[in-house]
């Protein structure tokens, strides 16, 4: 038997933010397992190959987030849909958010490599079913399967980087992954539109099949991580299925409420209210279960007990909230106001994608050289707030100098915080909690994005409603009604078909309505500057022991957690006896 070490928080360790060296006091807990081992020395070539494998996997998932956006009108016509077409995108995002944390915990038990391969296979299966869909229900089911697989691929790529590299080094690799993500998101509409126009919308899904196969082979050959020999039955029994059911069910209820509210159901409808209420009750039950009853918790409750980690999650929420706004509403501006085609709107978004890639990678280099993360986080939120504030000045006519410069400023800000908060979060936790904390971070990012789209759309629709009388006078009641409510953001083709005088009026109304939305996003982004002082200052560690996965490691972590809880209770009893 080999002996490895897992670094666990000492029960009486001081706050990391208060430590002069910015590091935890750690206690070494022996883990006896044949699968354990110390960090492997890898050559630069080996590291590069590992990153190629992970980046390919992330690229595929990110591309699928946006590749269908330009194919939606064609898919809508093929299946004779109405407002239900929005579920083609929503189903994918719901599945991603709901399944992220479960994938992370399964990988703690069975190891990273077999689980990321399973996630890739799940994504492949969903893509194949989507490409062959004979009806709308089949397509929606396929998108759910795709989302589940995509969630696993994305979160496990981030977890693998945390497993393999020290805090000091991993910032660079996270920065590279962030850059790949931004480029893929921008290319999605262009690739999807080109495939739809030249071949068929089904190729938006067929294209995933050879790419998935290549990624599968690359991961098998290049991803060098240790895999425990966990018996399948015992491993399945060790998963916290109660916590998984509570977290998935609660998340789905809340996100379904956000998807339905203001779209197919009024916000004050019984359906929406019940989904929200029972969703929050479910999360309260989930936290209670994870904190006191779960044998192998799905959620690291400890991160919600420290101010710095709570601040990091808040920063993550704000960054994702703003990023989704640019990814979702800038294309709407390009199409509805400037009259761009969906493909061109993807091209016009390139300044945002390129600037995010540059600042995300630069942040990783900075963290690797200095061991600090606070400076890029502060700079990022300042630039992000400035950039989104400048978006308020975008008018009904194209001013390309403004459009490009404003995107660069906002994109740089978003990129500085694309991965830095995740590194900050990992600096405050024990290595055994890395997978759970990383999944919680990704979960927060996904939920924030969903909320951002809904709130942004609500603000925009409310502003559009204020102009209905003037639009009805110019366009007539029927055309004006198509630009009201939920139809506003889905009417870009209608706007392009209008005669020039009427089209100019509509462009002005859309531009003015979007100003209020950008004001909201600017104010929300500025709130991050209030959160930043609570992040805590840590020096990123250079030493590293690779995370050990498997049942033996899970049992050791549980025993250590129970020991710490007992010591805290004993300390309280002694304090009461003294008093």
Swiss-Prot record:
Q: Where in the cell is it found?
A: Membrane
Annotated TM spans: 48-68, 83-103, 121-141, 145-165, 171-191, 203-223, 236-256, 269-289, 298-318, 336-356, 374-394, 403-423, 438-460, 516-536
* PANTHER family in the cross-refs: DRUG TRANSPORTER, PUTATIVE (AFU_ORTHOLOGUE AFUA_3G08530)-RELATED, MAJOR FACILITATOR SUPERFAMILY
Its topology with respect to the membrane? Multi-pass membrane protein
Q: Which residues form a coiled coil?
A: none
Name of the gene encoding the protein in the UniProt record? ppz2
Top-level taxon of origin: Eukaryota
> Where does this protein have compositionally biased stretches of type Low complexity?
10-20
The keyword Transmembrane belongs to this UniProt entry's keyword annotation: yes
Q: What is this protein called?
A: MFS-type transporter ppz2
Question: What is the stated purpose of this protein?
Answer: MFS-type transporter; part of the gene cluster that mediates the biosynthesis of pyrrolopyrazines, secondary metabolites showing insecticidal activity. Probably involved in the secretion of peramine and other pyrrolopyrazines.
> What species does this protein belong to?
Metarhizium majus (strain ARSEF 297)
The family line of this record is: Belongs to the major facilitator superfamily. TCR/Tet family.
Give the chief site where it resides. membrane
């Amino acid at each position: 038997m080999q002996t490895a070490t897992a670094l666990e928080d000492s029960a009486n360790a001081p706050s990391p933010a208060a430590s002069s060296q910015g590091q935890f006091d750690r206690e070494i807990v022996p883990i006896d397992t044949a699968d354990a081992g110390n960090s492997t020395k890898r050559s630069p070539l080996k590291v590069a190959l590992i990153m190629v494998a992970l980046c390919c996997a992330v690229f595929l998932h990110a591309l699928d987030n946006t590749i269908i956006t330009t194919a939606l009108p064609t898919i809508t016509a093929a299946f004779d849909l109405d407002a239900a077409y929005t579920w083609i995108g929503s189903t994918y995002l719901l599945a991603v958010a709901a399944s992220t944390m479960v994938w992370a915990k399964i990988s703690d038990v069975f190891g990273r490599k077999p689980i990321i391969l399973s996630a890739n296979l799940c994504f492949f299966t969903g893509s194949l079913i989507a490409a062959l869909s004979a009806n709308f229900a089949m397509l929606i089911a396929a998108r759910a399967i795709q989302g589940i697989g995509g969630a696993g691929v994305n979160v496990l790529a981030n977890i693998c980087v945390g497993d393999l590299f020290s805090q000091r080094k991993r910032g660079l690799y996270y920065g590279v992954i962030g850059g790949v993500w931004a480029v893929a998101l921008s290319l999605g509409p262009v690739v999807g539109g080109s495939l739809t126009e030249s071949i068929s919308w089904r190729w938006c899904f067929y294209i995933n099949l050879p790419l998935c196969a290549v990624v599968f082979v690359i991961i098998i050959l290049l991803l060098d991580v240790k895999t425990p020999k966990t018996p399948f039955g015992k491993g399945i029994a060790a998963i916290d299925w109660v916590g998984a059911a509570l977290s998935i069910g609660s998340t789905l209820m809340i996100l379904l409420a956000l998807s339905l509210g203001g779209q197919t159901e009024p916000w004050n409808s019984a359906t929406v209210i019940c989904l929200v209420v029972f969703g929050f009750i479910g999360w309260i039950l989930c936290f209670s279960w994870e904190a006191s009853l779960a044998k192998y918790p799905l959620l690291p409750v400890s991160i919600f007990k420290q101010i710095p980690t709570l601040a990091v999650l808040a920063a993550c929420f704000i960054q994702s909230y703003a990023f989704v706004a640019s990814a979702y509403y800038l294309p709407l501006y390009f199409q509805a106001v400037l009259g761009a085609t969906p493909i061109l709107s993807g091209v016009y978004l390139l300044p945002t994608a390129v600037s995010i890639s540059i600042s995300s990678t630069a942040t990783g280099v900075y963290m690797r050289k200095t061991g600090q993360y606070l400076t890029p986080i502060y700079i990022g939120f300042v630039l992000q707030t400035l950039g989104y504030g400048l978006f308020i000045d975008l008018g009904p006519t194209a001013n390309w100098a403004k459009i490009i410069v404003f995107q660069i400023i906002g994109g740089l800000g978003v990129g500085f915080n694309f991965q830095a908060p995740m590194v900050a979060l990992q600096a405050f936790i024990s290595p055994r909690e890395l997978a759970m904390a990383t999944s919680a971070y990704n979960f927060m990012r996904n939920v924030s994005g969903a909320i951002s789209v809904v709130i942004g759309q609500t603000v925009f629709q409310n502003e559009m409603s204020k102009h209905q009388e003037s639009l009805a006078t110019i366009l007539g009641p029927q055309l004006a009604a198509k630009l009201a409510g939920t139809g506003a953001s889905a009417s870009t083709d209608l706007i392009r078909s209008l005669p020039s005088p009427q089209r100019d009026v509509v462009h002005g109304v859309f531009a003015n309505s979007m100003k209020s939305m950008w004001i909201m996003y600017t104010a929300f982004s500025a709130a991050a500057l209030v959160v930043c002082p609570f992040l805590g200052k840590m020096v990123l560690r250079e030493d590293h022991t690779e995370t050990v996965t498997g049942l033996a490691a899970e049992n050791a972590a549980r025993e250590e957690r129970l020991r710490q809880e007992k010591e805290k209770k004993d300390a309280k009893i002694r304090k009461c006896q003294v008093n």
